[in-house]
């Protein structure tokens, strides 16, 4: 989380959604699981291909990690919805607002299979579907405090 991201967001609910997403990464231990997976794939490929195939090992390992990364992003999105549902204050699909804005600005030019993140359209749909299942999409937490926070940055 950094000041540029806070300035990019439109409201407190979006901020809560993004924070929930980042908390989910920590809670679900995505970074440590990613590192374990990455080093495991590299070692396996090195053993199979021999020591002189470093470039091939690096490329294959990197491509293999993209799917894991997208899965972790999708999982963090879902947990963000669940965390916000537990607050009974914020609309639990707050993170979707961030992706709606990103999609409008064309920030999904990379094909999903080559990206570390799912495309914004998929993320919006998944977040809103989860929110509908939990019945927590239409809560309002409008606050002038968020505008004050943004202007102080």
Where are these regions (language model features)?
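A Zn2+-metalloprotease active-site environment signal
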Residues: 1-153
């Amino acid at each position: 989380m950094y000041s540029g991201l806070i300035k990019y967001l439109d409201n407190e609910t979006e901020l809560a959604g993004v924070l929930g997403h980042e908390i989910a990464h920590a809670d679900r231990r995505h970074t440590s699981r990613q590192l374990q997976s990455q080093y495991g794939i590299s070692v396996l490929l090195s053993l199979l291909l021999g020591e002189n195939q470093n470039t091939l090992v690096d490329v294959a390992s990197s491509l293999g990690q993209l799917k894991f990364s997208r899965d972790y992003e999708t999982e963090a999105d879902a947990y963000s919805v669940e965390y916000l549902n537990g607050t009974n204050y914020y609309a639990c699909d707050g993170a979707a607002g961030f992706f709606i804005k990103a999609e409008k600005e064309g920030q999904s030019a990379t094909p999903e299979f080559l990206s570390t993140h799912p495309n914004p359209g998929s993320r919006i749909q998944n977040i809103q579907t989860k929110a509908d299942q939990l019945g927590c999409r239409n809560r309002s937490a409008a606050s002038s405090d968020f505008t004050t926070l943004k202007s102080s940055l």
